[in-house]
Amino acid sequence: MQHLDNLLNEAVANNDLPFVVAMVGTAAGVSYSGAAGSGAGPDTVFRVFSFSKAIGAMAAMILIERGKLSLDSRVVDILPEFGNLQVLQGFDGGRPCLRAPKVQATVRHLATHTSGLEYEFWNADIARYVGMTAHPGMLTGLKAALHYPMASDPGTRWGYGMGIDWLGLVVEAVDGRRIDAFCQQEIFDPLGMTSTGFEVDPARLAGMAIRGEDGRFAPFNLAPPSRPEVYGMGHALYSTAPDYLRFLRMILKKGVLDGNRVLAKASVAVMQADQMQGLLFQKMMSAVPLITADFDPFPGTRVTHSFGFLRNEADIPGRRAAGSLGWAGICNTHYWIDPARDVAAVFMAQSLPFAEGRVMRAFENFERAVYARFVRPA
């Protein structure tokens, strides 16, 4: 325990992070809880951004389990407005060149980031399109913000984007409840995630910082809007470290936590399996360095995507086993789930740029220490 505490304190003392909260758990319970820095603790609420995506995938899986949706349901058959999206093929004289997609995206495409929809932070062409058209940004909370063009045809490559925001709209259309009510009733309440939701008490919200050119952190704010037109299922949740660890432990326990079953074992297996249909994760190249660095968590390793999670297909020496699941939020919240070794963890800060080298080293050091001290040998 002390070694993990020391690693967190060193990361803050070295100015890698302004503060950090970390927790480790197994199917049986919580193994470790620690924090460093003065900005946060276990009760602090974080902007978890893309931690939201796994929750959104689970919401869709609940409907799949109930026979109301399938992995290969075409999005346009549920949301006709999705049929208006076109593929961006470059620019001609400063004008975007658009065409109809060759195939229609499915629910599986949305959950695996193979729908063709990509964020402007990691796609220079989409960033250029947004700049020249004054397209509303994702954090406006406007439904129109989701109507980005596709960067490629569905099913042709992995590209990180707003697919799960669209998946949230699919859930709403199929179920009839707004996505916040659906998640509250079907996920958060049964799992005892009492501090997780789309709205936040400002008194509990962590501060946030961005690293300047001088290497120092300065206050900054990046957050979803309150009471938006649409809640972004891919980015708009707030949560705490203990709450999110409960969600991860439910996955370790194959759909049940504290006697409350929220997914069938078979559904959890589908969520964990490679759903990329032969495609592979591609290194994320930053188009906005102020906000994010390039991101490739396991260079040289075959990496796929399950129904909601990034998945490494080989053991990472000294770290997670093959078949582990994980992802992150843009303000440097990170998590992983290792079903083979029965461990899950969260490592949560509130800083930019995302995935800068010193942050990723601190996270890797923490993960290695967890496996060295808590995890049974393979």
Model region roles, listed by residue range:
Residues 1-49, 68-70, 84-92, 96, ...:
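Short, conserved catalytic-motif segment at the N-terminal edge
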